[in-house]
Design a protein with these regions (language model features):
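Hydrophobic alpha-helical segments
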Residues: 41, 52, 116-117
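A contiguous strand-loop segment
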Residues: 11, 62, 66-88, 172-174
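Short, solvent-exposed loop/turn and secondary-structure capping segments
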Residues: 44-48, 87-88
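Sec-exported extracytoplasmic/periplasmic mature domains
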Residues: 22-26, 36-43, 55-59, 75-82, ...
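Flexible, glycine-rich surface segments
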Residues: 80, 84-175
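Export/targeting segments at the very N-terminus of extracytoplasmic proteins
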Residues: 2-36, 46-72
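Short glycine/serine/threonine-biased micro-segments
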Residues: 40, 44, 91-94
Length: 175
């Protein structure tokens, strides 16, 4: 199961996760959870060719976002000696253990193993640290919760308890 795979991932990578947690201030369990959601703890890095995937999107009309990502893919390919025709990605061109789009790979990637290359495919240290760095650089606050309270919209505010129970939600909207 996913939970067992997560426990195994944390156990096998405990020292790395502990070190990254100290260095970046991001909980090892959140890091592991993201990697679990993105790649099933590294067991599935994708089956697509990122060059084909991003190239196709880059030349759709008025799609400057993917044109920039194509350039970023070429930059990371050259910098880290990755062949964009043979590495694997998700259907959306996301790369490596944390499934980063090329610009995020270039911007948030961390060479945590110190070999001079950010390698989110073959280095667990780099992949784990890059996920933590992404969270830290995007406002992660050490010791904070990853969720926040929200106000329920009018659509849900008028529902009776019986109506809410019929929705089969795993949380209570009326708290």
């Amino acid at each position: 199961s996913r939970i067992n795979n997560g426990a195994k991932f944390v156990k096998e990578n405990f020292e790395i996760l502990e070190s990254v947690e100290r260095d970046f201030g991001v909980s090892k369990f959140y890091i592991a959870s993201i990697i679990g959601c993105e790649t099933n703890y590294g067991s599935f890095l994708g089956t697509y060719n990122p060059l084909d995937t991003i190239f196709t999107r880059a030349f759709e009309p008025e799609n400057s976002f993917w044109q920039k990502e194509l350039i970023q893919l070429f930059i990371l390919s050259k910098e880290y000696n990755l062949d964009p025709k043979t590495i694997k990605s998700s259907w959306s061109g996301a790369l490596g253990l944390g499934q980063f789009i090329p610009s995020s790979y270039n911007f948030y990637g961390v060479d945590y193993d110190g070999d001079g290359v950010v390698d989110m495919y073959n280095s667990r240290k780099d992949g784990i640290a890059s996920v933590a760095n992404y969270l830290k650089e995007n406002g992660w606050k050490t010791g904070s919760f990853a969720v926040s309270e929200v106000t329920v919209g009018k659509k849900f505010a008028s529902l009776e308890d019986d109506d809410i129970a019929k929705l089969q939600l795993s949380f209570n909207l009326n708290k």
